[in-house]
């Protein structure tokens, strides 16, 4: 095993093998424990894209809320699933299939296009130009603004979908989809997440669909693996302590080092990870 590989595995808490049912229970109990400790909270809010990660996080959250209602008799415990399209979403059917699978208590829809376009126009008013990539990050951050607005109106906390295969590459928007209150998938790689969806009875297309952030107008539905330059299979193998090609390992480690700032709170004078 490569020296940095061992360090990364330890930092992200990845196990080489898992029991999916045990990990489902672990995440559900985690979500319930947070509510029991913070009794002022009654809802969890999650943006739903129609991909594997939000499908899994949503299913775990709904299960936690069902158990909270059963255990406390308090029907105020609700899971709010939020659709956050930029205009019309090409894979809207997948998003609705995910919502149907998870049986969300409440479903909301917020079209982020007007607010994103307004922000782009405001910044460009001085003659500067927002790149398509930068605009994609604005979309991700606007989605989180909407989720926190909904959570604020409903005594809620926001659920994030970050997992080990994203964390190692930093493949999320800082203070966008990377900004949340709880991340119940943290510690799981991509194939492990799919295994949890299988035991939860998810339709296969929800975890077999090619992962995409789908943030760029000029490159719609760009596969994550194309953007990263490495396959999720290699990322998962690396995180599980297996041998991968030097090229794959070097690509993963390059992303890990480049995106270290994303895995930290704002940097203070006491931090030295970046030096």
From Swiss-Prot:
Name a GO molecular-function annotation: NAD+ synthase activity
This protein's pathway reads: Cofactor biosynthesis; NAD(+) biosynthesis; NAD(+) from deamido-NAD(+) (ammonia route): step 1/1
Q: Name one GO cellular component term.
A: cytoplasm
What positions does the entry give for ATP binding?
47-54, 161, 190, 212
Alphabetic keyword roster: ATP-binding, Ligase, Magnesium, Metal-binding, NAD, Nucleotide-binding
Residues binding deamido-NAD(+), per UniProt = 141, 174, 181, 261-262
Classification via InterPro entries: NAD/GMP_synthase (IPR022310), NAD_synthase (IPR003694), NH(3)-dep_NAD(+)_synth (IPR022926), Rossmann-like_a/b/a_fold (IPR014729)
What does the record give as the reaction this protein catalyses? Answer: deamido-NAD(+) + NH4(+) + ATP = AMP + diphosphate + NAD(+) + H(+)
Instruction: Please name the GO terms of the biological process aspect recorded for this protein, alphabetically.
Output: NAD biosynthetic process
- EC? 6.3.1.5
Q: Which residues bind Mg(2+)?
A: 53, 166
Query: Top-level EC class, please?
Result: ligase
Family, as annotated: Belongs to the NAD synthetase family.
Provide the function of this protein.
Catalyzes the ATP-dependent amidation of deamido-NAD to form NAD. Uses ammonia as a nitrogen source.
Q: How does it assemble?
A: Homodimer.
> What is the name of the protein in this document?
NH(3)-dependent NAD(+) synthetase
Q: Which organism is it from?
A: Lacticaseibacillus casei (strain BL23) (Lactobacillus casei)
Kindly list the organism's lineage: Bacteria, Bacillati, Bacillota, Bacilli, Lactobacillales
Gene responsible for this protein? nadE
């Amino acid at each position: 095993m490569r020296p940095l590989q061992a360090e990364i595995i330890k930092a992200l808490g990845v196990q080489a093998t898992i029991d999916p049912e045990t990990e489902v229970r672990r995440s559900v109990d985690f979500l319930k424990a947070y509510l029991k400790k913070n009794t002022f909270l009654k809802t969890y809010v999650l943006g739903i894209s129609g991909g594997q990660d939000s499908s899994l996080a949503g299913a775990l959250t709904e299960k936690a809320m069902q158990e909270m209602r059963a255990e406390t008799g308090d029907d105020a415990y609700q899971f709010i699933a939020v659709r956050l399209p930029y205009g019309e979403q090409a894979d809207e059917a997948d998003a609705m299939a995910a919502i149907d699978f998870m049986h969300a208590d409440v479903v909301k829809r917020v079209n982020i296009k007007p607010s994103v376009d307004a922000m782009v126009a405001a910044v460009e008013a001085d003659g500067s130009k927002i790149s398509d990539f930068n605009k994609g990050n604005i979309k991700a951050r606007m989605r989180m603004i909407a989720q926190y607005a909904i959570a604020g109106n409903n005594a809620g906390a926001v659920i994030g979908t970050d997992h080990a295969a994203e964390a190692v590459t930093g493949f999320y928007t800082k203070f966008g989809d990377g900004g949340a209150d709880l991340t119940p998938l943290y510690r799981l790689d991509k194939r492990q997440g799919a295994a949890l969806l299988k035991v939860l009875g998810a339709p296969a297309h929800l975890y077999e669909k090619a992962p995409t952030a789908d943030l760029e107008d000029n490159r719609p539905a760009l596969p994550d693996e194309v953007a990263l330059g490495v396959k999720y299979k290699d990322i998962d193998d690396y995180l599980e302590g297996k041998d991968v090609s030097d090229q794959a390992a070097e690509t993963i480690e390059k992303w890990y080092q480049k995106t270290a700032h994303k895995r930290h709170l704002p940097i203070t004078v006491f931090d030295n990870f970046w030096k």
